[in-house]
């Protein structure tokens, strides 16, 4: 991934870091990104249907959330922002001005499915099992739960409408985390003499 084109590297970092849906990442706007603090606002999604083409719609839960990026993701996003500005300058009058962070070389919005195609090609090129963008969402959720992030915060970070949704989807990871908690509590007695 380190040698991947910066646009795709940044998209992948954000998918891994935030656990956002691919449409939410594709719908991220520069006006909702603070490159100083690393705070982003997820408040829409870029979607596609044959009848409408590419269009902006609400998030799945019709809500918004603020998220703080990891320093590594922020650094890669800043690299992409420089490349974005270079592309804008190179294209001049041909640049299609759109508000989105992730665009094609001419400034037009990326198709929401393009990340799936890119990751499929990346997997084939590097002879690794195919990774669907939604797998990063599951990884983010599992990582938060395994590291003790409470279910309400995990649900909020993922943009789930209810912690119950999160609990139902990640019941196995929650069971593992609870077993780990029991082991930690048992350790209190083991260390007493």
What residues fall within each predicted segment?
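C-terminal secondary-structure termini that scaffold catalytic or DNA-interacting sites
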Residues: 37, 46, 50-73, 79, ...
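Basic, Lys/Arg- and aromatic-enriched nucleic-acid-binding interface segment
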Residues: 1-28, 35-36, 47, 63-64, ...
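A short, basic/aromatic helix-end/turn motif that makes direct DNA contacts
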Residues: 27-33, 155-161, 171
